[in-house]
Every structure is written in C-alpha cells, then in structure tokens.
UniProtKB/Swiss-Prot annotation:
Family: Belongs to the PPR family. P subfamily.
Main location: mitochondrion
Short name of one Pfam family: PPR
Transit peptide: 1-31
Keywords tagged on the record: Mitochondrion, Repeat, Transit peptide
Listed Gene3D superfamilies: Tetratricopeptide repeat domain
A GO CC annotation given for this chain: mitochondrion
Matching SUPFAM superfamilies: TPR-like
Identification of the protein by name: Pentatricopeptide repeat-containing protein At5g61990, mitochondrial
Compartment(s) of residence: Mitochondrion
Coiled-coil residue spans: none
PROSITE patterns in the record: PPR
Domain of life per record: Eukaryota
Taxonomic lineage from the root: Eukaryota, Viridiplantae, Streptophyta, Embryophyta, Tracheophyta
Amino acid sequence: MMGSMLFRKRTLVTRANFLLFRSFSVNVEKLSDASAEIAGILKQENWRDTLVSSNLSIEINPEVVLSVLRSKRVDDPSKLLSFFNWVDSQKVTEQKLDSFSFLALDLCNFGSFEKALSVVERMIERNWPVAEVWSSIVRCSQEFVGKSDDGVLFGILFDGYIAKGYIEEAVFVFSSSMGLELVPRLSRCKVLLDALLRWNRLDLFWDVYKGMVERNVVFDVKTYHMLIIAHCRAGNVQLGKDVLFKTEKEFRTATLNVDGALKLKESMICKGLVPLKYTYDVLIDGLCKIKRLEDAKSLLVEMDSLGVSLDNHTYSLLIDGLLKGRNADAAKGLVHEMVSHGINIKPYMYDCCICVMSKEGVMEKAKALFDGMIASGLIPQAQAYASLIEGYCREKNVRQGYELLVEMKKRNIVISPYTYGTVVKGMCSSGDLDGAYNIVKEMIASGCRPNVVIYTTLIKTFLQNSRFGDAMRVLKEMKEQGIAPDIFCYNSLIIGLSKAKRMDEARSFLVEMVENGLKPNAFTYGAFISGYIEASEFASADKYVKEMRECGVLPNKVLCTGLINEYCKKGKVIEACSAYRSMVDQGILGDAKTYTVLMNGLFKNDKVDDAEEIFREMRGKGIAPDVFSYGVLINGFSKLGNMQKASSIFDEMVEEGLTPNVIIYNMLLGGFCRSGEIEKAKELLDEMSVKGLHPNAVTYCTIIDGYCKSGDLAEAFRLFDEMKLKGLVPDSFVYTTLVDGCCRLNDVERAITIFGTNKKGCASSTAPFNALINWVFKFGKTELKTEVLNRLMDGSFDRFGKPNDVTYNIMIDYLCKEGNLEAAKELFHQMQNANLMPTVITYTSLLNGYDKMGRRAEMFPVFDEAIAAGIEPDHIMYSVIINAFLKEGMTTKALVLVDQMFAKNAVDDGCKLSISTCRALLSGFAKVGEMEVAEKVMENMVRLQYIPDSATVIELINESCISSNQRVEADAVP
C-alpha cells in the first residue's frame, strides 16, 4: 500500500511539473518568443506581480531585455522604463549598452526628454568608453524607427557628459557629430567653450571653435567675448582686437542680440570709435521690435549729442515702433519734433498715427490729428478715412462713421469694399440690419460690387437674429450678382442653422458646398458635431467626427479637447494620449482646458508621471495653467497622500497670481485629513476665513471626518454644530462619519442619539445606520442589538432611508457567526418580504452559518434556492458548498460543482481560487479517498494557473497524500 502511494506521489509530481513547464516556460532558443511573452505581460496594469508569479523558466537576461526594448511591441515608453529599472535593480548581470540606447531613443520619440536624460546619465555612470557609447547610439538610431529628431538624443548625450564634468568626452561627441552632419545648438557650444576656458584646455577650445566655424554656427556676443579671452590668454592680443572689429561687422548685419549689440556699441565708444548711423538704425529697429521703446528713444538723443545725422528714416523706425507699442502720443510728439527740425513729414506717417490711435480707441486725438493734417495742407487719403471709420464703428458710433463715408464721396475719394464692409459690419453689430442692407444696395448703385465677406456678414447676422427668410434672400441676391459663396459663407449658414437645430437645412448646404468644389473644414464639421451633441444625438455626432477624419480635415482645439475628454471619461487614457499627440503632430495648439482634461484623465487612471509630464509640456509650450489645471494636480496628489507635492503646487499657483477658491482648499484639506495631519487641515480652514472664503458643506464634511478618525469627537461635534448654525445642511456622509467616530470610541449610545439631532433629516441614505448597525452587532451588548433591531424594524429610522440589502447582510452575517440561525433566517425572510433581493453575500453568510453549526443538510436547499434566484456563485460560495458535499460524502455532486467552477473561470476569470481554497478542496477529496479525483482537480488548478509554482504543487500533493493515508489508516481499523 505504501509503495503504491509513493509511486502515485512521484507520478503526480512529474505530471504537475510537466503541466507547469507547458504553461509557463519559454524556449530559451527562441528569444523573440520570450520577448513577445514579456511584452504581453507589460501591457497589463499589474505587470510586476504577473511577471514575478509567471515563473518563466528562462532567466530575464540582458539579451531578453534588449529584445523587448528593440521589438517595439510595447507602445508606452514609460512602462518600458519602469520594466528596465525593475530588471536593472536586480543587479544580477550588467545590462547591454544597446538597451540603454534603444530605451533613450524610445523616450525621446515620445517627448520624454527628462527621462531620456536620466537613462543617458546612468549609461555614462557605467563608465563605458565614449567611443563605444557613441557607436551604440549611432547604430541603434539607424535601426530605430520613430518620429523624433535624430539630433535630440545626441544633444542629450552631450548634455549628460557636460553635466557629469566629462569635458573630453563631450568634445568627442561634438567632433563625432560632424560625421552625421548634425549642427549643434549655439547654447551647447557656449557651455562647452566656457568649460574649456575654465579648465584652461585651449587645445580643445580651438578644436571646438574650428568645428563651429566649419558647421556655420552663428556666433553671438558672448561667443566672441570668449574668443577674445582665449586669444588674450594665449598671448594673441592683436587677434583679440581683430575679433572685436569682426564683431562690429557682425553687428552691422544684425546677427547679434540687442543687449549684446548695445554692449558692443558701448565698448566701441569707450575705444573712441563712433558707431555709424547704420549701426544706430539697426539698434533702434531692434529695440523697437522687442518693445524697449525708452531705450530706443534714448539712442535718438545720443545720436544727436554725438553729431550723427537724424533723418526721416531714423524717425520713421522709432515712430513705427512707438505705434506698434500702442504709444501713439509719443509718436505724435516725434512728428512735431520732426517739424521743428525741418524734416519733411510724409503723409503715411500721419496715416499710421491715425490708424494706431483709432485702434487704441482714442478717437478724439485721432480726429484732432486728422484735422491737423488737413490744416497743414495735406489731403487725407483713403487709409486715414478708413482708420477713422473703423475706429468709430468699433466704438458703436456707427453714425459718425457713416458721416465720414459720405464725406469721402463728396471728396471723390474711392471707397474700397473693405471700408463699405466696415460700415456694414458696424450696423450689423449695432442691430441695424436694415441699414446694413441699404448700404449694400447703395454700393451696387455706385458701381462697387459687394464682396463675399460683406454678404456673409449680412447672412450671418440675419441667421443670428432668426431672420432665416432674409438670410436666404441675401444669399440668392449674392448668387445673382455672380458672387459664389465661399467656405466662410457656407460655414456661417451651417453654423447658424445648426444652432437653430435646423439640421436638415444645414446638411443641404454641406452637400451644396461639396458639389461646388469646396472642402469642408473643422468649423464646418464642428457645427454639425456641436449641433447634434446639443440635440443629444451622439451617434450622429460620432458619424461626423468619423467623416471629418476620413476627409482628412484637421479638428480644431475645441473638438480635440472634446474627444480627449470623452476618452478620459471612459478610462481610455492611451487613446486620449494618442488623440493629444495627434493634435500636437498636426500643429494644433491646445489651451489650458485641453491639458487640464488630459491631466485629469491620467490622474484618475493612476498615470501620475504622465500627468506631470503633460503639465511640464504645457508650461514648456507657453500655455499658462489656470485654477482648474492646478486643481487637477492638487487633487491628484492629495488623493495619493503626497501632501508635500500638493502643497508645493498650491504655493506655485499662488505665486503665479492665481487665487485659490473653496474647491482648491477642499482638495488640500481632504488630503491633510486623509494623511492624519488634522492640525494642518484646521489651519487651512482658518486661512479660508481670513481670506474671505466661506467654507461650504464639503469643507465641513471633510474636516469633521478627519477629527472623527483622529478620535477628537468634541471638535467634530463642535464643527457639526457650527455647520448647522451657518445654514449648511449635513448630508448622510456627515452622519455616517459621526456615527462611525462614536462607535470607534465604544460610545454606541451617543451614536444612536445622532439620528435625532436633525429634525429635517438628511438626504435619503441608509449609510448612517448601516454604520451604526455594523458597530452594534460587532461590539454591542445583546440588549442593545435587540433595541436597534426593533427600532429599525418598526420604522424609527425611516426618515433617514429604509433598510437596504447591505443593512440586512450586516445583521444576517453577524447572527450566523453567533450561531443564531433562526434569527438570521427570520431576517432573511423579512428581507425578501421587503422586496429586497438577497445577494451572493447573503446566501454565503447563511451557508457558513449552517456549516459552522454542523447543519450541512440544510445548506443544500439554500444553495439550490440561490441558484434558482439567479445568484452567480463566487469562489467563496463554491468552496463552502463543495466542502459541505465532501464532508457529507457526496463526492459526485462536489465534482459537478468543481467542473462548473472551472468552466466559469475559463470563460471570464471571475472565480479564481486562492491557494487556501485549493488546499481545502484537494484535502477534502483526499480525505474521502478520492485521490484520482484530487489528481484531476489539481491538474485543472495548474492549467488555470491557480497554483503559482512547483513548490506549491509538491506541498499540496504532500498534504493530500497525508490526508489519504489518514483515510487508509481509518479504514484499516477493525
């Protein structure tokens, strides 16, 4: 008998190991298969646990890691970086150099430059020879397929060596890049030159300088300055002077920045060299372009003091700069100064001043200059009139604008369609649609044909005012004039009709515009998408989104933001990121809302690093975060418990001049409460009052919860009373929190009294007394349990909400654990009478109760009733009932349920067994002498990956054999 048992044990071990090998092993010779398997695991959220528990028969060696990185099977480089870090942290063997290169390239391709730099720095720290590192990056770059600029990683490598202080290696990278025809940035070259000067490596300095010249790198003042220092340090003073004069030549071609040019100009004056007029003109022009107008004006004074001639050109440069800087008064002063100097003033200077003044809205000054121009004998031309008319119309003074239009006619000045259009637009904006229409008829009568812009303005305004018939009449007249509607006209029609929900008419114009050879754009499709969304016809909206893409139309940022938001709402952050990257690749610049929506989606799906990277990218693109953007970050880090980070972002937000609102404070306050930093939460509450912000119900709910969990019920109830005094109605969460807090301190009686503190009650919810019941049945005395149960059943708590399935499940479970099955069964029937459906938890509690009391015969009808009621058993329920069948010797029925359980797992993985459950099942079959059945069950457990490794298999087999031996010994007893 014992020999047979030993043989069976060995057979089981052999078969189990074979099954494990077939399920988890990877052929070492097939590297790509291993790479594919690992890549598949990496696509899972819990890839680390899966990878560790997979027990791959091959070791994850450097060759496999390299294969995974170069295979491009994993789209998320951040996940590849996490995998690489995890493998590298094992410190078993050194990773291959090419692995670093491929990973850095992938990160660069995804725009994660900071992460790429960290990988490069780790590569440098391995102390590989720079030639090998360079060769690896070149080789991998040639093999890599991506959209990143080839020069990005080489620049990062250069930065890495500089940051580590490896100057010679940085020079090697600089020199080697010449072979790839890469032009280094001037900023990088200057950093390298500066380092070489500090280390007095003039030999390498001149090599780098020569390379810069050969690659036509444009020098700035600082570069020339370092060159002069190098010459002087080498004793070549004359060469240093030559560089200075060469810099003057560069200055004349305006290749230096303005500050550098100013410094050079000062050095020239100090050396007794008076800059040429051309030099001053370039400087004034440069200063005006960067809006340093006071500096530009001071140069005008300096020119005069040095005897440099001032002419019309110099003044015009400064006047133009002042006008572009919206400083029309100063420009007007220069005009008078020119008159005093006897410099001829050209009419266009007046026109420019009048134009800017009109745009600034200083119409009195503009009109005064206009009248002064006439007084000086100059006749204003069409531009001056057009500027004034536009200014008056912009200020809604359409009548004054129209009078100037009449004056133009009297002076026989040709009126352009643009000027007519300005008056038409002004009248439309002021609501005088009939007057605008009369101007159009007046145009036609005078022989000036209205253009499509003017007609579109009229049509658009008629549609906005729901005068659809007039809009169609104007459209018809436009066509009769031989003017074909353009894309803007059709878009105005489609947008106006879509907003009025006249979608069929809008669609007819879409068909017409396509027939006329016009291609719909994002505004066209956007009108349909917005119209259908507003009408809650989402399927139709999706149809137009798809049609837009199929037609190759780029969406605008509003549509892109909407798509990103929808993806994030559905938890599809990969698709959301893809939509964002597609938007960026297509040159569409998002706004703060775009980035906020994406960051919020990433945080909600635990992509914290990616959310931070998007925030940095947002700042890098010059898009200023708003309160909502900062709120997403503060809320995300607060929920993660990283209050140091959340507080830092809060401080940054304040430093940026943004004022936090109550919602922002609630986010921080909640984070501090969850982290147990209740005093900091109280400080925030006080700070809100100091800043004039009124805490709302959420504020009080949050901090009351914090004090309850910290055990300070006195402060919690004080805030509870304060909340009600301020007219804020506590919701069910507040009551639940207070109940839970009282019960934690074993003050159940006080918890019961809470329900009588608010005569108006709170939002209908069973949560407060579910919390109470849980504590009462867990720790309360029998009398208290009976009292609460009676009050619950007689409706005393009904104003707070009727008992739900959770209420009954709590009570039934505790009664079953106490062995009070009759009371539990009575509650079960009351639950059904209250039209509440028992759940799998309800039935499992009853089954456990009967099993504990040894009343297994009563378990089986309960289980049958659960199945008949449509309950889907979980692994706990299956385990309980199967063990009951085994204990009663009903092996066949137990095996039927085991097969059902295995089949269910194969379909939806919804019933995966734990090791303890596996142990109980195998032991149960072994104890009743069903070793063949136990063997079959074990094979299924291995196949479905319930058992993680061979060691566990052997352990379970040993236990089963022991149980079987005990059965044999029991049978042998006479």
